Amino acid sequence: MTHPFVLLKWLIAKLHFGFSAEMLEQHGFFQHVTHTWLVMAILIGVGLLATHRAGLVPGGMQNFMELVLVEIRGMVRDTMGPKGMVYFPLIATLALFLLVSNLIGLIPGFAPPTASLNTNAALAVGVFLVTHIVGVREHGIRYFKHFMGPVWWLTPLILPIELIGHLARPLSLSLRLFGNMYGHEIVLMIFFSLVPLLLPIPMMLMGILVAFIQTFVFMLLSMIYIAGALEEAH
């Protein structure tokens, strides 16, 4: 949201030494970085609660997190196959971080980190690098053969197309998430300014749906990209 609590502004100023809350308010980057730290703290706290006194018969937070992770593991297995299960921790971390980041923006006084292009670009570039590192590790130098095309005389045509397609992946991942989350924030802000009591409620409910959909899309595309790098290079 665009009107943080006074306490949150004070905390931001304390975290970024040498800056006042007013100065930080002029730079949305610092606000999103601070909320990113908050999301990480929430995930660490949930993880500690889930693993504290963990038992064979799960209960409470352990039961909830096991249900969430089992669902994510099923999606990873269905999309990437058994060979892709080694990347389950990466995909699960992405999914949990994105979901909490998207949902936190629905709380008045908080801004979703995913409404910043910097956050989304960092995640998208990370997926891009992992994809090609996996490809090289699995297939060696043969991984780059699929950039050249099936026959050598098609290389001048296929190579630029493949390069543009791969370079567009982090761009599309980051811009899609940024556009949806930032756009929803703007719409919600407008509704709050017009009718601050009841009218924003449907938009907030839609925001929950958008948060889950955007998390799923980012996670699914990441799995598809990495699974493509795992396949036999042709």
Swiss-Prot record:
Coiled coil: none annotated. The keyword Cell inner membrane applies. Pfam families: ATP-synt_A. InterPro entries: ATP_syn_F0_a_bact/chloroplast, ATP_synth_F0_asu, ATP_synth_F0_asu_AS, F0_ATP_A_sf. The keyword Magnesium does not apply. One of its GO terms (molecular function) is proton-transporting ATP synthase activity, rotational mechanism. GO terms for cellular component: plasma membrane; proton-transporting ATP synthase complex. The chain crosses the membrane at residues 29-49, 90-110, 116-136, 147-167, 186-206, 207-227. Keywords: ATP synthesis, Cell inner membrane, Cell membrane, CF(0), Hydrogen ion transport, Ion transport, Membrane, Transmembrane, Transmembrane helix, Transport. It is a multi-pass membrane protein. It is found in: Cell inner membrane. One of its GO terms (biological process) is proton motive force-driven plasma membrane ATP synthesis. CDD domains: ATP-synt_Fo_a_6. PANTHER family: ATP SYNTHASE SUBUNIT A, CHLOROPLASTIC (PTHR42823:SF3). F-type ATPases have 2 components, CF(1) - the catalytic core - and CF(0) - the membrane proton channel. CF(1) has five subunits: alpha(3), beta(3), gamma(1), delta(1), epsilon(1). CF(0) has three main subunits: a(1), b(2) and c(9-12). The alpha and beta chains form an alternating ring which encloses part of the gamma chain. CF(1) is attached to CF(0) by a central stalk formed by the gamma and epsilon chains, while a peripheral stalk is formed by the delta and b chains. Key component of the proton channel; it plays a direct role in the translocation of protons across the membrane. HAMAP family: ATP_synth_a_bact. Belongs to the ATPase A chain family. This is ATP synthase subunit a 2. It comes from Syntrophotalea carbinolica (strain DSM 2380 / NBRC 103641 / GraBd1). The lineage of its organism: Bacteria, Pseudomonadati, Thermodesulfobacteriota, Desulfuromonadia, Desulfuromonadales. The gene is atpB2.
